[in-house]
């Protein structure tokens, strides 16, 4: 998936083309756009919209230089999803301005509200959408480095040229594993989705008990709690948490400036480990609040 993002941008962008990148989001989009000669334009997503991209936000960011929108849903780090009704509104703006979409759907099998809908399936969108996906998240095959891209032949053919000269091909062993996953892995994916959903609900329950503000994510395997009440930056909070409780979480700012005041919490761990992590998190937060009461 990661290489496909790079190849797609190299194939599609001319120097100076603007790439719209909603944030918080995966860290590779901005550098890939720059390496391809593009100009990244960040759209800051808002917690009050559950970190979804709205048609109004998209419309406001488009200029005559806009070539491509990156659509990173289900989202890393927020866990946000785009429902079909959201995508339909986005699609109308895309068609109106005649731009392309790079839809990163690597977490498409991990949704907990409704089945994932790809924007490429909407009327008039297939010919202007590159869909990126892979096996790392859906089938827990992160180390196999196997992904794929779907889209209009004219773009895929150019991506293939870049791919051939960059790494030649994915390892044959990974490709055989991918075929096996597609043929016989559906039951495993469903079981994993159910397990993740239980962990997701557990984390949300614990954060509520701690009194932390946290919107409910319905995709991927991340929760994005707000820690702004403590008067610390996300990086300061994460660093102190690591030093005092030996618990490592990722500052929201790792995924864009608008991630300030948030932390990314992954639940791609056993429930036993998550319980221990939440106990340490609660102890840390309790200490901060007691410290604040003394200073007040």
What kind of feature is each model-predicted range?
Residues 2-296:
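PLP-dependent class I/II
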């Amino acid at each position: 998936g990661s290489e496909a993002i790079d190849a797609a941008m190299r194939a599609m962008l001319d120097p100076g083309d603007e790439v719209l990148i909603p944030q918080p989001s995966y860290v590779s989009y901005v550098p890939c756009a720059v390496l391809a000669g593009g100009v990244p334009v960040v759209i800051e997503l808002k917690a009050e919209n559950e970190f979804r991209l709205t048609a109004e936000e998209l419309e406001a960011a488009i200029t005559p230089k806009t070539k491509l929108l990156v659509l990173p849903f289900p989202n890393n780090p927020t866990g946000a999803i785009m429902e079909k009704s959201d995508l339909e509104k986005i699609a109308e703006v895309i068609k109106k301005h005649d731009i392309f979409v790079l839809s990163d759907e690597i977490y498409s099998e991990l949704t907990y509200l409704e089945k994932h809908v790809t924007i490429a399936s909407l009327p008039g969108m297939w010919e202007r959408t590159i869909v990126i996906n892979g096996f790392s998240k859906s089938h827990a095959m992160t180390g196999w480095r196997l992904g794929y891209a779907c889209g209009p032949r004219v773009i895929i053919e150019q991506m293939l040229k870049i791919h051939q000269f960059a790494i030649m091909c994915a390892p044959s062993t990974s490709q055989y594993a991918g075929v096996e996953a597609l043929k016989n892995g559906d039951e495993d994916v469903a079981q994993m989705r159910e397990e993740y959903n239980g962990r997701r609900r557990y984390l949300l329950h614990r954060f509520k008990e701690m009194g932390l503000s946290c919107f409910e994510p319905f995709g991927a395997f991340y929760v994005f709690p707000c820690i702004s009440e403590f008067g610390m930056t996300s990086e300061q909070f994460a660093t102190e948490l690591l030093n005092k409780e030996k618990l490592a979480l990722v500052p929201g700012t790792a995924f864009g400036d608008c991630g300030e005041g948030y932390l990314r919490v992954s639940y791609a761990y056993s429930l036993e480990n998550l319980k221990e992590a939440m106990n340490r998190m609660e102890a840390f937060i309790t200490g901060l609040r007691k410290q604040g009461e003394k200073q007040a």
